[in-house]
Amino acid sequence: MVNTLKLPVGIDSFEKIRRNGFYYIDKTNLIEQILMNWGEVTLFTRPRRFGKTLNMSMLKSFFEIGADVSLFEGLYIAKNKELCDAYMGKYPVIFLTLKGVEGLTFADAKRMLGTILANEMDRHYYLKTSDALTDEDKAYFAKMLTGTDENIKDSIRKLSQLLYKHHGKKAVIIIDEYDVPLDKAYQNGYYREMVSLIRGLFGQALKTNDYLQFAFLTGCLRVSKESIFTGLNNFKVLSIMDSRFDEQFGFTDDEVKKLLASYGLASHFPETKEWYDGYHFGNADVYCPWDVINYVDELNYDQTVEPQDYWSNSSGNAIVRRLIDKADVQTKDEIERLIVGECIEKELSQELTYDELDKNIGNLWSVLFTTGYLTKQGRTADGKIRLAIPNKEIKNLFIKKIREWFRDTSANDGKRLEEFCNAFLEKNTEKIEQLFGEYLWNTISIRDTAVAKEKKENFYHGILLGLLGYKANWLIKSNAESGTSYSDILVEVPNNRTGIVIELKYAGNGDLDAACAEALKQMEEKSYVDKLKQDGMRNFIKYGIACFKKDCRVVIAG
């Protein structure tokens, strides 16, 4: 029977998912693992959209006083009755997600942080009338509710103290996306001020806090301990390199197969794996949950839908562009190897500060790994990490960013672009060949590997389109229907009514002349100029272009 449960697209509240009949992949084993591997302060680092917030929401629902036992019925953790009796619903919980702390100025971001803290205070509004609190405590709490600046650094510690007075229990502190304020501060130029604020906030809450039971933090980066966790000796970091908890963030093969089968979509497993699997956390191979849930949700309505770039489209992916912008010859070569499925070997830094990210290429490789753009494929004998692109979605992202970089850098040299485009009108094949070849040598290409010929042609096709697009008054059509087939590129130059046909071929065996001849023959057989004639063009120029690796050949039809 096909599952009728709704899919939780974009929902990261455990309680909402369980109460409202959404499909839930059981990750409550995380609770048991946490309690069996005790740590007073635990930081989980995982890429974005890997279920961090949902898991933290689950921990809140489990530990918080007044916990609803029914939320966990039928789940893994409910089988461990002894553990549930000892810990479920036993602690006051302070739950903060810092993903919304941003602003163009430090004052704006600080104000936003104050609002988030005040909202969490408001969730414990009962403290305002608690008999266990003194009048001084209540006055302080009322002041904290306003979110005023001077209370920020001590606010979490003070709230845990007030909760202890009321409940007689130490607090569980959960801070989700702890590093977002630092990331935004780095982007907007107030990094040092934000580091000072967060260091003070965390130092009070996590280091010198007698009212802390245990704390859980999540983030994408393991920010240097010396940066914001100074002196925190009770600190345990569980990164994507750690085998502990390796299946608790992300979906496993079996979980994805079960999900697809539940909705009658088992036949779509191969493409789901090709596009969204490939991440190696510890000893586990996992899929990106955001991708899988979105894809299954779309398949549920239309089984012909193709996989999409859900994860990569949920962010600007600036880190990939920064790598490409800074790439020297060696780095370009390494990016090319990654795109065709090879591994590169790197020494990675596990602890960075945001202001170190751009200091060298090595730091950028480390961040790409930590944030999910690259994954681990083992180690070398000397301890280097073998890095690879995890799946088809991320490969597409790299290619997209390379094209954007090529377009932007090419546009900076308008004189050269003008010369290149005019060479097509002047029938100057030598100039076209020379300049196109130079562009190919300066970009990052797809190598001659098992990649399908059509994919290689698409790469060169995209570069050529980007270059010709410099001419704002030229009408350029890609893969336009013409005659009895589709031509690669049609160009209409209105001011002299000239139509240009370009057929591009990839010379898989390296024979550029033969590939050009094939292109010209195809143009004659398919009557590609018909569409240009219909559009009023009177003069016609036909080019066959062949590419192999970073070489090209250009011929013109007689």
Where do the PLM segments sit?
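Phosphate-binding site recognition
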Residues: 1-456, 471-473
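Structural signature of nuclease core domains in nucleic-acid processing machines
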Residues: 429-558
